[in-house]
A protein has these predicted regions:
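Membrane topogenic/interface segments and analogous intrinsically disordered interaction regions
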Residues: 1-269
């Protein structure tokens, strides 16, 4: 009897009289989902530690022909193992986190919004992976080869780098290109919301290109080839974003009309 009373009290805390979830219920659901994501992250890090040596091998495969890797500080090698394992844990957690974000927001979304939300998360994940793969397969090998052998002279200088510097460069490039490849998706979202339009993107393209090259100069080694290799894809993606903005741009009036039509359809159902 006492157990049934406790269950009813807990249910009353979570669900309101009209069947909707209370603030306490939402907070409990959010807490549970955060705990699940945290557990997945911890498990991912622990499992990745067992394969940290293989992960380091994958990273260093791009530069082994051009560099000799050394560990300068006593803790340097161990710290890179931890860094790579933590990054692998994040990679494993991101799809799970995306799912729980969608599941948490789904009750408050319309059918069309729910479908668009799922599409955005899926495309975002795919584009980020494509950006990282582009950096790993194309950009990084060329950059490492150029930085090592592109300048003639001083042949007595050995091309040696610390494992920390190398891992820093790799992870920085992966994150940059992963984020840069999200540009078309961000443009689609903002254009669909009516915040930006193709005319605006065309007007500011000169400023945008200057900013792109400035960012490339900050995040890459100080040589023009590396800067152009980073800035080139960013400029190309910017012009692709202009094209996509022209397809998906909708003024606010159109969005309001669509919302009204969706509401009418739901009332009829």
């Amino acid at each position: 009897m006492a157990t049934n009373v406790k269950r009813k009290k807990k249910k009353a805390e979570v669900m309101a009289e009209d069947g909707s979830m209370t603030l306490t219920g939402h907070l409990k659901e959010l807490r549970n989902r955060l705990i699940i994501c945290a557990v997945v992250f911890v498990v991912g890090v622990v499992v990745s530690l067992a394969y940290a040596d293989r992960l380091i091998d994958v990273l260093t495969a791009m530069g082994r022909d051009y560099y000799e890797f050394v560990s300068i500080a006593p803790q340097e090698k161990l710290m890179q193992y931890f860094r790579v394992s933590i990054l692998a844990g994040v990679v494993v957690t991101v799809p799970v986190a995306f799912y729980h974000i969608y599941a948490f927001a789904k009750p408050g979304l319309k059918r069309s919004e729910s479908a668009f939300f799922k599409l955005v998360m899926l495309l975002g994940l795919i584009l980020f992976c494509v950006g990282v793969l582009f950096a790993y397969k194309l950009m990084m090998p060329f950059m490492l080869r150029f930085l090592s052998t592109g300048i003639n002279g001083a042949e007595y200088i050995q091309t040696t780098t610390s494992i920390e510097s190398y891992v820093n460069l790799c992870l920085t490039m992966f994150i940059i290109f992963g984020c840069v490849f999200e540009m078309p998706l961000i443009t689609i979202i903002l254009s669909k919301m009516g915040i930006i339009n193709p005319q605006l993107l065309k007007q500011v393209r000169g400023v945008a290109i200057v900013i792109i090259f400035f960012i490339a100069a900050v995040v890459t080694p100080p040589d023009i080839v590396s800067q152009c290799m980073v800035a080139g894809p960013m400029v190309l993606l910017y012009f692709i974003s202009i094209f996509l903005s022209g397809i998906f741009y909708k003024p606010h009036e159109d969005d309001d009309d669509e919302d009204d039509e969706d509401d009418e359809d739901e009332e009829e159902e």
